[in-house]
Amino acid sequence: MARDYYDILGVSRDAGQEDLKQAYRRLARKYHPDVNKEAGAEERFKEINRAYEVLSDPETRARYDRFGEAGVSGAAAGYGDMGDMGGFADIFESIFSGFGGVGAGTSRRRTGPSRGDDLRFDLKLEFREAIFGGEKQIRITHLETCTTCNGSGAKPGTKPRTCGTCGGAGQVRRATRTPFGSFTQVSVCPTCNGKGQVIEDKCETCGGNGQAQVTKKLKITIPAGVDTGTRLRVSNEGDAGQQGGPAGDLYVYLFVQEDPEFRREGINILSEVKISYLQAILGSRLMVNTVDGEVELTIPPGTQPNTVLTLENHGVPRLGNPVSRGDHLITVLLEIPTRISAEERELLEKLAKIRGDRIGKGGIEGFFGKVFGG
């Protein structure tokens, strides 16, 4: 008994076209004969193609839903007949373009210039470095074009020859007949590994790769206002390209270390300051730490616990516009003494009487509760 086409693709019976397409891409890549050499993979691949051919067409899908396999016998074209398959041919070609594509029209030369790979470098910054920016020196290792052979991979005085297997195309084609039609498979040339050239006398410096690993120092400019997750791009500092292609880029990912005193919230900086109950009642002026150094902070009379006071323009510069800065927000914490002298107690009790506060049972703590809204 034939397997259910929905089960073959691993989708529900109400799956939409996008769900079908995604399932097909995933399974076709997994079971393609060039990728999967296990026994039964080719038959599984044929099942997947048959199921997608039927279900991707609304008309044949409707017949299949009503009559099953009997309703679509002979309806599918088979994956060798790309001319009548419309969108199916497009998706099939796009899926396998990574290893050669399918059909006579999909052959692509792999020779010629190719861009180098991009590289990633993780960089830790101190809290203040992220706020104000500056320069950092880093050490990276990347591939550069071999200076001995100028990237050809061949020993100086010699040059690569055209691959005799693929004729310089970098790909070979193999025609296979299946129950579903003729299948032309294009794959990377096994002789030259897709380069189209064979190096007989390899460069002694790079071993025929045309590239060599080099460790170098770079100065990175850190803009003011960066944060964890900010990514900086350094052009052309990735791996060198091949066959004269451009180099890739270096991407520097920033990670900002925590500060024991300050926290960051967007472009604002947060910190705390402890004051005495007398400073809270009478008001005060005191020096507090900011990223710019010590700054005078005014404590208004009657300041309540957890009041947030603002020092404008002492926060983080706005990334891309360092003239504009956030604020420094300071949370006021109140220090209530656990012990006081007899003289202090006497004075506080006199003050409580003047205010008309009863402090009998709660003692002087009850007085503080009244004063600070407790």
Curated annotation (Swiss-Prot):
The J domain is necessary and sufficient to stimulate DnaK ATPase activity. Zinc center 1 plays an important role in the autonomous, DnaK-independent chaperone activity of DnaJ. Zinc center 2 is essential for interaction with DnaK and for DnaJ activity. Participates actively in the response to hyperosmotic and heat shock by preventing the aggregation of stress-denatured proteins and by disaggregating proteins, also in an autonomous, DnaK-independent fashion. Unfolded proteins bind initially to DnaJ; upon interaction with the DnaJ-bound protein, DnaK hydrolyzes its bound ATP, resulting in the formation of a stable complex. GrpE releases ADP from DnaK; ATP binding to DnaK triggers the release of the substrate protein, thus completing the reaction cycle. Binds 2 Zn(2+) ions per monomer. It comes from Cyanothece sp. (strain PCC 7425 / ATCC 29141). One of its GO terms (cellular component) is cytoplasm. Zn(2+) 2 binds at residues 163, 166, 189, 192. Residues 4-68 form the J domain. One of its GO terms (molecular function) is heat shock protein binding. NCBIfam families: DnaJ_bact, PRK10767.1, PRK14293.1. CXXCXGXG motif repeats lie at residues 146-153, 163-170, 189-196, 203-210. InterPro entries: DnaJ (IPR012724), DnaJ_C (IPR002939), DnaJ_domain (IPR001623), DnaJ_domain_CS (IPR018253), HSP40/DnaJ_pept-bd (IPR008971), HSP_DnaJ_Cys-rich_dom (IPR001305), HSP_DnaJ_Cys-rich_dom_sf (IPR036410), J_dom_sf (IPR036869). Disulfide bonds: none annotated. Homodimer. The keyword Cytoplasm applies. GO terms for biological process: chaperone cofactor-dependent protein refolding; DNA replication; protein refolding; response to heat. It is found in: Cytoplasm. Its cofactor is Zn(2+). This is Chaperone protein DnaJ. Belongs to the DnaJ family. Signal peptide: none annotated. Its main location: cytoplasm. Keywords: Chaperone, Cytoplasm, DNA replication, Metal-binding, Repeat, Stress response, Zinc, Zinc-finger. Pfam families: DnaJ, DnaJ_C, DnaJ_CXXCXGXG.
